[in-house]
C-alpha cells in the first residue's frame, strides 16, 4: 500500500438543493471525520434560485465544519461547477460527490482507501441503480458512446462519486475548453484506474436537474467535445450517399433506355423522394459541422468557463493547518 495522502478535499456542486443540504452536510461531515486525515469540504453553488447559497454561506461560517462555500454568479453546469471547486481544493486526493444524496457520502473513506493504494482515479459503479427506466437507458447510451468514441472502457461514466489524485486534478485545471466531461478528461491523464461498486439510493429531496433536453444536450457535448469521430462518420455517410446517387442515376438512365420516356415521367416522385433524403442528410451534416464550429468559436473567445462571485470560509486553510502540524 502506498499511503502518501496527507489531506483530502471533497468537492460537491449544488444547484437548487436547499431541501437536501442540511442532511448532505451532516452526513458528509460524519464521513470525513472517519478518514483520519485533515480534510475540507468545498460546496459550489451553481447559480441556484432557491436558498442553497444562503445555506452554504451559513455552513461555511462555522470554523468547526471545515467548509468552503464557492458561489458562482449564474448557472454554468455541473462540470464547470466542479472545476470551480477543483480550483479551490488543495487536497492530495479530491473526491467529487453529487448533492442529491443518491450516492451516499459514507463511501468517501472507502474511496480514499483505494486512492491510497496508488490509483490515479477511483471510479464507481452504481449498484442496484434507483433511477427511472428512461434515465437508465439514457445513461447506458451515453456510456456506450463514450466507450466507442474514446476507447476507454469504464462501466459507469455518469456516476460522479469519484476520487482523483492531485496530479490528475492539476492536469485537468490546465485544460481550458468550455465543454468538459470530467470523468473522461481525468481518464485521459490517468495511468492507473479502478472502478468499485457503490450503493445507489432513491432521491429523497426534490427532483433531478437533468431533464430530457439537458440529457440530449449532454449527448451532443460528449459527441463534439471529446472526439472527431462523428465528422469521420459523416464523411463516410457522405461517400456512401454519393455512390448510391451515382448508381441510382445509372439505373434510371438504363430504365429510360429500355422502357422509354413514359417510365421516366412516372419516376419523378421517386426522384423527389431520393432527393429529399439526400437534402435531409445534408442538413444533419451541416448541423453537426455547425456544432463543432460553434464550440471552436466559443473556445477562441477565451472567456472564463465560470465566474466566482464570492467565496466564504471561516475554517483555517488546509495547507496552513498542515504547516502548523509540521512545525
Swiss-Prot record:
Primary localization: membrane
SUPFAM superfamilies documented for this protein: Nucleotide-diphospho-sugar transferases
UniProt catalytic activity: UDP-4-deoxy-4-formamido-beta-L-arabinose + di-trans,octa-cis-undecaprenyl phosphate = 4-deoxy-4-formamido-alpha-L-arabinopyranosyl di-trans,octa-cis-undecaprenyl phosphate + UDP
Superkingdom of the source species: Bacteria
One of the record's GO molecular function terms: undecaprenyl-phosphate 4-deoxy-4-formamido-L-arabinose transferase activity
Pathway(s) the chain acts in: Glycolipid biosynthesis; 4-amino-4-deoxy-alpha-L-arabinose undecaprenyl phosphate biosynthesis; 4-amino-4-deoxy-alpha-L-arabinose undecaprenyl phosphate from UDP-4-deoxy-4-formamido-beta-L-arabinose and undecaprenyl phosphate: step 1/2; Bacterial outer membrane biogenesis; lipopolysaccharide biosynthesis
Ranges in a coiled coil: none
Enzyme class: transferase
Cellular component, GO annotation: plasma membrane
GO biological process assignments: 4-amino-4-deoxy-alpha-L-arabinopyranosyl undecaprenyl phosphate biosynthetic process; lipid A biosynthetic process; lipopolysaccharide biosynthetic process; response to antibiotic
Membrane-spanning residues: 233-253, 268-288
Keyword terms: Antibiotic resistance, Cell inner membrane, Cell membrane, Glycosyltransferase, Lipid A biosynthesis, Lipid biosynthesis, Lipid metabolism, Lipopolysaccharide biosynthesis, Membrane, Transferase, Transmembrane, Transmembrane helix
Subcellular location field: Cell inner membrane
Enzyme Commission designation: 2.4.2.53
Topology in the lipid bilayer: Multi-pass membrane protein
Pfam families, per database record: Glycos_transf_2
HAMAP family: ArnC_transfer
Family stated for the protein in its record: Belongs to the glycosyltransferase 2 family.
Function: Catalyzes the transfer of 4-deoxy-4-formamido-L-arabinose from UDP to undecaprenyl phosphate. The modified arabinose is attached to lipid A and is required for resistance to polymyxin and cationic antimicrobial peptides.
PANTHER family listed in its UniProt record: UNDECAPRENYL-PHOSPHATE 4-DEOXY-4-FORMAMIDO-L-ARABINOSE TRANSFERASE, UNDECAPRENYL-PHOSPHATE 4-DEOXY-4-FORMAMIDO-L-ARABINOSE TRANSFERASE-RELATED
Protein name: Undecaprenyl-phosphate 4-deoxy-4-formamido-L-arabinose transferase
Species the sequence originates in: Pectobacterium atrosepticum (strain SCRI 1043 / ATCC BAA-672) (Erwinia carotovora subsp. atroseptica)
Amino acid at each position: 500500500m502506498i499511503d502518501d495522502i496527507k489531506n483530502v478535499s471533497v468537492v460537491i456542486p449544488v444547484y437548487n438543493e436547499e431541501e437536501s443540504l442540511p442532511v448532505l452536510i451532516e452526513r458528509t461531515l460524519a464521513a470525513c471525520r472517519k478518514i483520519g486525515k485533515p480534510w475540507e469540504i468545498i460546496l459550489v453553488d451553481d447559480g441556484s434560485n432557491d436558498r442553497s447559497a444562503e445555506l452554504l454561506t451559513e455552513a461555511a461560517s462555522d470554523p468547526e465544519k471545515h467548509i468552503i462555500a464557492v458561489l458562482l454568479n449564474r448557472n454554468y453546469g455541473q462540470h464547470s461547477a466542479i472545476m470551480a471547486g477543483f480550483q479551490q481544493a488543495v487536497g492530495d486526493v479530491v473526491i467529487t460527490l453529487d448533492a442529491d444524496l443518491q450516492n451516499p457520502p459514507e463511501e468517501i473513506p472507502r474511496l480514499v482507501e483505494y486512492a491510497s493504494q496508488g490509483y490515479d482515479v477511483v471510479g464507481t459503479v452504481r449498484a442496484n441503480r434507483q433511477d427511472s427506466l428512461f434515465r437508465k437507458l439514457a445513461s447506458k447510451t451515453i456510456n456506450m458512446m463514450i466507450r466507442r468514441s474514446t476507447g476507454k472502457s469504464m462501466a459507469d461514466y455518469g456516476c460522479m462519486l469519484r476520487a482523483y489524485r492531485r496530479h490528475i486534478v492539476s492536469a485537468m485545471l490546465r485544460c481550458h475548453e468550455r465543454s468538459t466531461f470530467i470523468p473522461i478528461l481525468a481518464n485521459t491523464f490517468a495511468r492507473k484506474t479502478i472502478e468499485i461498486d457503490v450503493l445507489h439510493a432513491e432521491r429523497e429531496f426534490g427532483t433531478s436537474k437533468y431533464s430530457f433536453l439537458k440529457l440530449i444536450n449532454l449527448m451532443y457535448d460528449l459527441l463534439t467535445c471529446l472526439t472527431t469521430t462523428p465528422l469521420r462518420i459523416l464523411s463516410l455517410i457522405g461517400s456512401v450517399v454519393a455512390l448510391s446517387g451515382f448508381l441510382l442515376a445509372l439505373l434510371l438512365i438504363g430504365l429510360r433506355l429500355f422502357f422509354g420516356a413514359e417510365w421516366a415521367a412516372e419516376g419523378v416522385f421517386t426522384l423527389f423522394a431520393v432527393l429529399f433524403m439526400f437534402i435531409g442528410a445534408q442538413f444533419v451534416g451541416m448541423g453537426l459541422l455547425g456544432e463543432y464550429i460553434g464550440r471552436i468559436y466559443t473556445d477562441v473567445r477565451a472567456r472564463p468557463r465560470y465566474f466566482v462571485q464570492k467565496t466564504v470560509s471561516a475554517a483555517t486553510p488546509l495547507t496552513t493547518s498542515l504547516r502548523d502540524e509540521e512545525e
